[in-house]
From Swiss-Prot:
Gene that specifies this protein: RAB9A
Enzyme Commission number, as recorded: 3.6.5.2
Catalytic reaction(s) noted: GTP + H2O = GDP + phosphate + H(+)
Binding site for Mg(2+): 21, 39, 62
Entry-annotated residues carrying Phosphoserine: 179
Topology versus the membrane: Lipid-anchor
Alphabetically ordered keywords of this record: Acetylation, Cell membrane, Cytoplasmic vesicle, Endoplasmic reticulum, Endosome, Golgi apparatus, GTP-binding, Hydrolase, Lipoprotein, Magnesium, Membrane, Metal-binding, Nucleotide-binding, Phosphoprotein, Prenylation, Protein transport, Transport
Protein name: Ras-related protein Rab-9A
UniProt main location, coarse: membrane
Lipid anchor positions (S-geranylgeranyl cysteine): 200-201
Similarity-based family: Belongs to the small GTPase superfamily. Rab family.
GO molecular function: G protein activity; GDP binding; GTP binding; GTPase activity; identical protein binding
Activity regulation field: Regulated by guanine nucleotide exchange factors (GEFs) which promote the exchange of bound GDP for free GTP. Regulated by GTPase activating proteins (GAPs) which increase the GTP hydrolysis activity. Inhibited by GDP dissociation inhibitors (GDIs).
Protein localization: Cell membrane; Endoplasmic reticulum membrane; Golgi apparatus membrane; Late endosome
Length: 201
């Protein structure tokens, strides 16, 4: 892409095992790996795209969902432009924990205006037939907690994955002053963002 692009930092949060790494890899590489291990700490991948005429470099951060990795993941919340809160539709506990993930992010990211911060909610693993969280339950949570957009996704068959990430970009574009994010696309520098201290597939 020629000219100027916007660099957006998007972070995936949610319980371990809900498919955050698979969603990131499906979107960036269009691949699904059944052998992915739980993330240790954080890792990120970049994706260049055009949304509604805007050229964007999306820096997608995947975080470890296990409680014991909290000290590793929370320093990387700062500077995020959007947060994708993720649960698995076949795991009701991961859905119930969304509020805790939201609170953790707002606190450690030092979000100044939580009411207007762009969150997108993902209900992953809809390819699994036996689900514990209904579409209506998830939609009601989104309405009650900030009228957030909700996508039911499957990293396995790519259902709604691209649509969810593109909506995240739209939400950022609608709320952010893009002048703070402009970069030259032919010399993309990520030095202003922290690098992961530890990562795993």
């Amino acid at each position: 892409m020629a000219g100027k692009s916007s660099l957006f930092k998007v972070i995936l949060l949610g319980d371990g095992g809900v498919g955050k790494s698979s969603l990131m890899n499906r979107y960036v590489t269009n691949k699904f790996d059944t052998q992915l291990f739980h993330t240790i700490g954080v890792e990120f991948l970049n994706k260049d795209l055009e949304v509604d005429g805007h050229f964007v470099t999306m820096q997608i951060w995947d975080t470890a969902g296990q409680e014991r990795f909290r000290s590793l993941r929370t320093p990387f919340y700062r500077g995020s432009d959007c947060c994708l809160l993720t649960f698995s539709v076949d795991d009701s506990q991961s859905f119930q924990n969304l509020s805790n993930w939201k609170k953790e992010f707002i606190y450690y990211a030092d979000v100044k205006e939580p009411e207007s911060f762009p969150f997108v909610i993902l209900g992953n693993k809809i390819d699994i037939s036996e689900r514990q969280v209904s579409t209506e339950e998830a939609q009601a949570w989104c309405r009650d907690n900030g009228d957030y957009p909700y996508f039911e996704t499957s990293a396995k068959d790519a259902t709604n994955v691209a649509a969810a990430f593109e909506e995240a970009v739209r939400r950022v574009l609608a709320t952010e002053d893009r002048s703070d994010h402009l970069i030259q696309t032919d010399t993309v520098s990520l030095h202003r963002k922290p690098k992961p201290s530890s990562s795993c597939c």
